[in-house]
């Protein structure tokens, strides 16, 4: 429980001595895909068998990897844009709060809330839904720049908006729709 990687799904696992966690979205895609599987199959037994893993993934992210705005924090190259120059410096440094990760985080919290409700875990459902709403409100406040009519790719130090044009922007329109306009 004290490890910084506690509750994270690794990016790569070779053996217990060779585990790489350079992914911010492993937990997020896992929860989303369990939900998709349930929607497709109706396999409630599978959902029940995954509940403890889902709960651990979300709770460890809440406890260990969120900031005061509810944003999920990550390494500079821990998104799917994880290429590095000679294995060192990120090719596309995106700070610790990239837009696609925040949208997936919002989605994960909403799906987690739905799963918890489905499994009669009302208190957890309400808590995760409230956290999702916090992420949504803060995403709109910090990532959306109405003057430029743009969404920031990521937030840098002191919440400075980075308007680099990257394909990750499309996540904000589709996974799920986070913005009303």
Segments predicted by a language model, with ranges:
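Glycine- and aromatic-rich loop/turn segments at beta-sheet edges
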Residues: 2-16, 63-90, 141-158
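Catalytic cores of carbohydrate-active enzymes
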Residues: 65-74, 95-97, 104-181
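Aromatic-rich carbohydrate-recognition surfaces in CAZymes
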Residues: 1-75, 98-106
């Amino acid at each position: 429980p004290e490890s910084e990687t506690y509750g994270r799904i690794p990016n790569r696992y070779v053996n217990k001595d060779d585990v790489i966690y350079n992914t911010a979205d492993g937990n997020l895609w896992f929860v989303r895909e369990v939900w998709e599987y349930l929607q497709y199959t109706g396999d409630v037994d599978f959902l029940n068998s995954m509940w403890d893993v889902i709960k651990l993934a979300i709770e460890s992210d809440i406890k260990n990897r969120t900031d005061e705005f509810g944003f999920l924090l990550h390494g500079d190259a821990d998104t799917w844009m994880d290429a590095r120059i000679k294995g060192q410096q990120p090719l596309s440094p995106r700070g610790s709060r990239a837009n696609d990760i925040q949208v997936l985080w919002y989605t994960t919290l909403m799906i987690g809330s739905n799963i918890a409700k489905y499994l009669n875990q009302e208190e957890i459902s309400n808590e995760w839904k409230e956290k999702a709403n916090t992420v949504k409100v803060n995403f709109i406040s910090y990532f959306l720049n109405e003057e430029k009519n743009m969404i920031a790719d990521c937030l840098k130090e002191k919440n400075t908006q980075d308007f680099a044009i990257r394909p990750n922007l499309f996540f904000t329109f589709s996974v799920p729709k986070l913005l009303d306009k």
